[in-house]
Amino acid sequence: MFLIEADGKRIWHTGDYRAHGYMGKGLIPTLRKYATNIDTLITEGTMLSRNDECIHECKVSEKMANVMKAFKYVLVLASATDIERLASIKNAALEAKKTLYVCSKFMSSTMKFFTERESELSHGLFSFSPRMLRFNGLERIKNKGFVLVTGTSQISRVEKLLKELPIEETILIYSSWEGYYIIPEQIAVNPSYKKFRELFFNVVDIHTSGHADKTTIQKVIDVVKPQKTIFIHKERNAVLY
């Protein structure tokens, strides 16, 4: 979030935010402390045209853990840069007593970066120590079962991996926005999410938005009390209420 001061005006730019993540508890206290006497509030409006249920990340982790306990081989499609979702996946794997793996250097490096920067401040929540999945040790890994968190860029590796796993014991937890594989315009721009899902016989969607819902947006406006509010990242005709 940014406070911009110029020509005697104070502008508060929120960027993306939400209240239903692990860091959401700091949203309102931060605004009350710093977002005072604001002339213009620039707030995200991604969810203004959606009525998605925004469950808390804790619930996301709980649902994932239940799936991880039910299936021996679990692959999770998630963003490498979503620190809170990665924490949910890590905690779910711990609850299910399964080892967490990655299969790309980028996913591994982002987890390492998050650990170095945020582990201590988050009391271990954002501390990650995944193992790298390697095909030369696959038989040993298969015996114990695993959780593999990956992105669409690894589709060729995942396709190769699936040939070695029994279909009935393998599942994909799709942990991204459903619009990527449902909305024709989104598929036309980037078909990789749909193609990735279609590799699997068993698929379950477990996700919550990375953006503020309408209730949270209204609460932010009520706390900041700006003279003017500008919504960004929204559909053209979307309104708060």
Where are the regions a protein language model picked out?
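Short low-complexity, flexible loop/linker segments enriched in glycine and/or proline
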Residues: 115-118, 219-221
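C-terminal regulatory/interaction regions
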Residues: 91, 95-97, 125-241
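His/Asp/Glu-rich metal-coordinating catalytic cores
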Residues: 1-95, 99-103, 109-110, 116-124
